[in-house]
Amino acid sequence: LLAELGNNEGVGFDPAFVAARNPTNRAGVRFVADFYSEKYADEKADFVCCKMTLEHIANTEEFVSTVRRSIAGRRDCIVFFQVPDMSRVLRDLAFWDVYYEHCSYFTAGSLRRLFERCGFEVLNTTTEYEGQYLTITAKPATMRLLKTPASQSEIDRLLAETQNFSRRCGEGISAWRNCLKEF
């Protein structure tokens, strides 16, 4: 869609991509059946889009740093990532969004700090789809940024939300068990 709308070229990276099952005849779009890595740094991008992938990566700092090293000195390259918003999961007791294949979870603050640590200047973070997802837009930083730790109030809030989530999930399970006993 991005390639079509802007008359652009696009390259997708997916280690599970099978061309025979996913035929594409879209002009300017091609797929690489591999994990993205620095060996693809010669793929010059104006825009790097990574949606609903980062939460599946255990070493997120290494991956985001790889993206940063790959775009090197191209200061005008914009990166856009989208991940589930853990704050919403905790706040709204959205336990159905805690998947076994998700090994990394983010709040707006933790996502921002990750990108700053990896050499990006964060342009903005937003929530999308009624707060279900976090998005971050960034570009390569022109200078080394200071590492900003989480504030104590943010840590306290997340701790309280996590404890509340645990308690409320237990209560929800008990309520469902009682409901099922009635059948």
Regions found by a protein language model. Name each.
Residues 61-80:
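A short glycine-rich, Lys/Arg-flanked "PGG" loop and its adjoining helix->strand segment in the class I
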Residues 8-14:
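Conserved SAM-binding motif I beta-strand of class I
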Residues 123, 131-175, 179:
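Flexible, glycine-/basic-rich loop-and-beta segments that form/coincide
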Residues 79-104, 108-112:
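Short, glycine-/aromatic-enriched active-site segment of Class I SAM-dependent methyltransferases
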Residues 53:
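Hydrophobic adenine-recognition pocket in adenosine-nucleotide-binding enzymes
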Residues 22-41:
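Conserved SAM-binding strand-loop segment of SAM-dependent methyltransferases
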Residues 1-7:
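Conserved SAM-binding loop of SAM-dependent methyltransferases across substrates and taxa
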Residues 46-49:
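A conserved beta-strand element that flanks and buttresses the S-adenosyl-L-methionine
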